[in-house]
Amino acid sequence: NEQEPNEATEIVGGKVETVEVSRHPEASIPETDLSLADIERRRSHPLRWALIILAVLCAIIAPYWFGRSLAVNNTDSIVAVLGGVSPQGIALVGWVAVVIAYVGLAMAVVVSPSWPWLIVFVLGLACEQFIAGLSMLNLNFWYSTYVVYGKQAGLANAANLGIMGAAIGIAVYALVFVGLLVIIRKTSPLNVLTKSWASFILYFVIETIALLVVLFGGLLTTV
């Protein structure tokens, strides 16, 4: 019995033609003893992720406790260095540290290669945690700052408000962005608001509003 030709229809030179296809094409992927699980494990780079997680944990823990130790043991030196800085300037520094950390993390997610932005994220996080340690950031920070800094507690409180303002800005942005993803249809002209560049603009608008509230909303004189 003659085997029927193995044919396929393709567009060649703008015309529809029937071409013969080999029944046993040569494999384009070389043979390997690795299983699919082994291949996926290599692609996942577990060592790289372990180093990233370790770096993040170090950036969270070490700078905070170092800053806190300086605040407790070298209070006079810190007050002498920062005494001439306005509360608005201190709040701005805390806000900038959080924004840099978040932008580094966000860019690491959307940009390849991601490692330069991961470095930015870790450094920004370390700076934010160091400032948080110096300013005794916790849920009742105004008591801690008054005990440590006394009449100069306003400077530490300003740093805490800058950090918290930026963190609240991130939370508000996340809620707004998720809401846009849920409400706006893909066919809607407003879908442009869900693009990465538009989401970054939205983030900076929200963060700017949060900063203005901290600087000029009366919070620096209240806490």
Which stretches of residues belong to each language-model region?
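Canonical alpha-helical transmembrane segments
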Residues: 84-120, 180
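Membrane-helix boundary connector in multi-pass membrane proteins
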Residues: 176-197
